[in-house]
């Protein structure tokens, strides 16, 4: 095989590789942007009226054990998104991650609930879901 044919084959293979990776990279950029925006919202006091942010209770950007204002310890949010939907005893029903986020916004931050499909909720859920990357999905009531 000549050098020219080898070069043409190498270029063709590179073009094919780019054709397969470009859509994945294009999809990754908006996801990374949503995760970043969610992290910003998580740290901002703009979701409520009490001057608090999500990090008031969920310390370390949700990556470490937190504490409620009453002193009750709460677990880190690492892997938490992978546990939804789940049954909530206090609510007496199955809740989604979006419902839990809105409960925290309304009760903890004194804010107005977000639209479950609005851009702020999508960003917050994207951020919280990123904290579950690589964690096993925990489906209540299912035994392995």
Region locations from a protein language model:
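Electron-transfer interface patches adjacent to heme c in soluble/periplasmic c-type cytochromes
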Residues: 26-33, 44-144
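Bacterial N-terminal signal peptides that target proteins for export
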Residues: 2-12
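Classic N-terminal secretory signal peptides
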Residues: 15-17
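Sec/Tat signal peptide C-region and signal peptidase I cleavage site
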Residues: 20-26
């Amino acid at each position: 095989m000549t050098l020219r044919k080898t070069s043409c084959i190498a270029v063709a293979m590179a073009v094919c590789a780019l054709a397969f990776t470009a859509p994945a990279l294009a999809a990754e950029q908006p996801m990374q942007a949503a995760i970043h925006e969610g992290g910003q919202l998580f740290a901002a006091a703009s979701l409520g009226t009490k001057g608090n942010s999500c990090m008031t209770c969920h310390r370390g950007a949700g990556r470490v054990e937190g504490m409620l204002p009453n002193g009750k310890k709460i677990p880190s949010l690492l892997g938490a998104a992978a546990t939804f939907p789940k049954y909530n005893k206090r609510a007496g029903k199955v809740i989604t991650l979006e419902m839990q986020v809105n409960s925290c916004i309304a009760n903890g931050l004194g804010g107005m609930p977000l639209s479950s499909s609005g851009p702020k909720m999508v960003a917050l859920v994207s951020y919280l879901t990123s904290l579950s990357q690589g964690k096993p999905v925990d489906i209540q009531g299912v035994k392995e």
